[in-house]
Amino acid sequence: MKECPYGEKCYRKNPIHFGEFSHAHLDAIYAKGNESGDYEIPANYSSEMIHTQLKLLEKLFPKQATNKEQEAHSSSSKPAVTAPVASGSSSSGSLDTNPSGSSASGPAASQDTSNLAKKQKLNAKNIRDYIPVVIEKGGMAKKLERAAPYNMFLTAITDSKPTHSEPLSITLQEILDESLGEIESTVQINFMVDIGWLLGHYYFAGILDKPLLLLYGDESPELLSIGKFKQQVTAIRVKMPTPFATSHTKMMFLGYSDGSMRVVISTANLYEDDWHNRTQGLWISPKLPALPVDADTGAGESLTGFKQDLMLYLVEYKISQLQPWIARIRNSDFSAINVFFLGSVPGGHREGSVRGHPWGHARLASLLAKHAAPIDDRIPVVCQSSSIGSLGANVQAWIQQDFVNSLKKDSTPVGKLRQMPPFKMIYPSYGNVAGSHDGMLGGGCLPYGKNTNDKQPWLKDYLQQWKSSDRFRSRAMPHIKSYTRFNLEDQSVYWFVLTSANLSKAAWGCFNKNSNIQPCLRIANYEAGVLFLPRFVTGEDTFPLGNNRDGVPAFPLPYDVPLTPYAPDDKPFLMDYLQG
């Protein structure tokens, strides 16, 4: 087993990581602990983080295992290849940095700056040693062209070979493919980032020396000082107003040497596990050319107002380093974009006279009420996400009163008596996870916990299993988040949302109801997604479902329909099953 390159600085809490990498400091603490799970954690470590990591070791390497098995976990000396290095290449540079950013001292630091660096250089040549699914370069432009009009992809699954050649499957290397344009600079906005893994991809794409602006959410020791070692990288942690809020958006901007750019909105974090055996979704914009210097201020907007909504969203970060990119977006032609930008930003928000509600589920309601074709009230609202928040004591508390009340909107004239549509929630069952490519570890991306689940037993009546045999992904647990309404009888999809937002009040917002004032939607997180509305994508009232219709491709749902409800003995997968 390879030694984690971050050593004592490792902050990961993902079981797959601990199944692949050893950690000498954790192994030493684990070996001294008793069978009751009591450990002496040195004062110089974060007690909470170390305890969580030890619980993962308990699950992966039970005490009843022989000492030899545990020693094998701790004594393996082969360090991980965090990112490859090529000497003498102007587009590569050196990646052998000390992840903590501190001065090298002692044996552990010495290993970080010498053994790891040497190992990286030895393994610099073969992309397949670093990236499990490698697609031939140069073909992404044609793949994107064939994906029109939806431009929506799922990530390739390492252990599902059919996805490697599926037309609507994609890898990170393909997103960076030169056939889409010669990249001169990029922006990555994401929650969790493994900078070594990301720069490895940049290395193989030949853009390691290009400027990268990285906005991240999850605390990351190696990102704190990456700029000292990689001057082309500017890493900024997004400051959140409350401790429980999350900068959860996953979005990329790719700037090309001809002045054009591209926007990618994703559900995947930027680390290996999320691009391995997990179902993720991405929307990729067309190429967005630069506008003429003398273009009008409002030129280059799409019919969906995507450009304005995106700029308003980016301004909310209040990060000066984004200003050149906001200016670049303003000076780019977004008219080819056929989807709506759908964002969430922290704070309290009220309806405006021009844009309606600006963020969260209320923004989605405004767009649906204006543009969605009339929908029969019997058509369910189908939700799907990789985590579930605290939703209240019953289905009425937030799901119906707030969330479904927004997602039921359409352009039916006001005044008609409407009913609350059915609510369905796709979330992997225990059996779904147990049968996944990674077994129980496949649930590492599903952080729904027992404490929350115990408070909302009513939810099980609405749960649907994860099934995706049509897309070869039934065994690839979903980290994708999607929301839609479709009619199986006439094989139609009314609208579809792909987003970073899980089913939670923090992501979508919760109304503070006060009869004396206009309701205020309180949102905790940054989130970003896209809304597909047929009138803007295909010119029809609905998308085809299952088969093409009059030359219009079927909408590529990420899961099988009809849905499969939980059986009486099914139960949702809970993260506690991994943590003991």
UniProtKB/Swiss-Prot annotation:
Superkingdom to which the source organism belongs: Eukaryota
Principal cellular location given in the protein's record: nucleus
Gene deletion effect: Females have reduced lifespan and reduced climbing ability. RNAi-mediated knockdown in neuronal cells results in adult mushroom bodies with ectopic lobes.
UniProt note on tissues of expression: Expressed in the body and at higher levels in the head. Expressed in the delaminating neuroblasts and a few ganglion mother cells in stage 11-14 embryonic central nervous system. Weak expression is seen in gonads at stage 16. Expressed in the brain; expression is regulated by DIP2.
InterPro entries hit by this protein: APLF_PBZ (IPR019406), Tdp1 (IPR010347)
Protein's UniProt keywords contain Cytoplasm: yes
One Gene Ontology biological process: establishment or maintenance of epithelial cell apical/basal polarity
Region described as Disordered: spans on this chain: 65-117
Documented EC number(s): 3.1.4.-
UniProt KW keywords: Cytoplasm, DNA damage, DNA repair, Exonuclease, Hydrolase, Nuclease, Nucleus, Repeat
Localization of this protein: Nucleus; Cytoplasm
Site note Interaction with DNA, residues: S504
GO cellular component: cytoplasm; nucleus
Compositionally biased spans, kind Low complexity: 87-110
Record-level Gene Ontology MF annotations: 3'-tyrosyl-DNA phosphodiesterase activity; double-stranded DNA binding; exonuclease activity; single-stranded DNA binding
Positions annotated to bind substrate: K250, K481
CDD domains listed in its UniProt record: PLDc_mTdp1_1 (cd09193), PLDc_mTdp1_2 (cd09195)
Active-site feature positions: H248, H479
Annotated stretches, region: Interaction with DNA: 387-390
PANTHER family xrefs: TYROSYL-DNA PHOSPHODIESTERASE 1
Family stated for the protein in its record: Belongs to the tyrosyl-DNA phosphodiesterase family.
Record function comment: DNA repair enzyme that can remove a variety of covalent adducts from DNA through hydrolysis of a 3'-phosphodiester bond, giving rise to DNA with a free 3' phosphate. Catalyzes the hydrolysis of dead-end complexes between DNA and the topoisomerase I active site tyrosine residue. Hydrolyzes 3'-phosphoglycolates on protruding 3' ends on DNA double-strand breaks due to DNA damage by radiation and free radicals. Acts on blunt-ended double-strand DNA breaks and on single-stranded DNA.
Protein name: Tyrosyl-DNA phosphodiesterase 1
Chain's gene name: Tdp1
